[in-house]
Swiss-Prot record:
Protein name (record): Biogenesis of lysosome-related organelles complex 1 subunit CNL1
Keywords tagged on the record: Coiled coil, Cytoplasm, Transport
Region (Disordered): 1-21
Any Gene Ontology biological process: endosome organization
Cellular-component GO terms for this entry: BLOC-1 complex; cytoplasm; endosome
Cited CDD domains: BLOC1_CNL1 (cd24144)
Length: 122
């Protein structure tokens, strides 16, 4: 009995948003959240690395620390690349939404043409 009621709720909610705009909105918000999280992570990592590098310079401890810092800077660059990929996703979303607007307008025009044709034949 519960399966039927949950299925009918899913059908109703799918009927309320057949184009999946709500899911797209949630996905967009999540992408922005991830990007903000990446920026904060990069900021913290950069600050930490700069502080460590300053300690190395001040204390004169240069041996293995530089190699470790280079490895951490490489990780930081990878995070920046990931962030750049997220910005590219946003650009792709902008392109998709622009073409989506055009397709909706075309669908409305086609519908209106069909509606006019159906009313003339009656």
């Amino acid at each position: 009995m519960q399966d039927n009621s949950s299925h009918s709720r899913e059908s109703a909610s799918a009927g309320d948003d057949p184009l999946g705009i709500d899911k797209l909105t949630v996905d967009y918000d999540y992408l922005l959240y991830k990007m903000r999280d990446y920026v904060q992570s990069i900021q913290l990592d950069t600050t930490e690395l700069c502080k460590k590098q300053n300690e190395v310079m001040v204390n004169g401890i240069i041996e293995n620390t530089i190699d470790k810092n280079i490895a951490k800077f490489k990780e930081l660059l990878e995070k920046c690349d990931t962030l750049e990929n997220h910005y590219e996703m946003l650009n792709q979303l902008a392109i998709i939404t622009d073409t989506f607007k055009e397709r909706i307008a075309e669908a409305v025009n086609n519908y209106n043409s069909l509606k006019k044709g159906a009313s003339k034949s009656k």
